[in-house]
Amino acid sequence: MSCWRKAWRGEGRGRGVRSLRTFVPVNTSTDMTKDQSLRREGEHLLDEIKNLGKELLEESNEPRLLPAIYSRRSIRKFVDTPLTGEEVQILLEAGLRAPSSKNKHTTQFILIEQREMLDRLSHMRESGALFLQQVPLGIVILGSPMECERWIADASLAAGYIQLQAEALGLGSCWADAYGCYTGNGQESSEYVRNLLGIPYQLEVFCILAIGHKASDAAPRPTESLKWEKIHIERYPELEETEAPKE
């Protein structure tokens, strides 16, 4: 039995965690196929997963996740305090250490601190990027489609790592998409940013991260409010008859 299954069944957990409720055994009689058995077991395991996080928090009052993962929220209001050089260096190192397809590391970054340029970049989309007007630092994330066909995944991972590192430093962040978006005049957002910053055409503008000191904190999402129903075990559940596609 795999370790994660043991953990959700109540075996092999760390000290101080109380026992989960009794795992309901699966009916493996001859009239049940292997797939049905796996689905039944998966349903019971999912019930355990849904309650595990809440039970652990009630027991210890401390999140089991890394604090930055547990507490990170998108922040759109910042105070006008510049980041230190050390903070910026740590953020960039986090981005450079992100996983990369075939270890190519083709993602590039442009740091923007000039207020006038941040104001202009805030109009790269019809809506949803105005928070760039008040942020002390913007990081433009660039991908290289010619060098790496998985550039979108690489750029996404780099941006996510920077956001988590920002949270770990007590900073706030928010992601503003550029790739696949448009300005209010119908121009591609990536083209708009490219023209402003002189970005060569072999690079693609993926997003801009707003990084700064938070004007206020947002509370972490309660564990029970997470969409645990999006998790499935072994295979996707069968559709209900009402959900069956029309022929």
Task: Please tell me what each predicted stretch does.
Residues 9-10, 198:
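Short, flexible coil/linker elements and helix-boundary hinge sites characteristic
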Residues 10-16:
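Residue-identity detector for glycine
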Residues 16, 23-247:
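Acidic, surface-exposed loops and disordered segments
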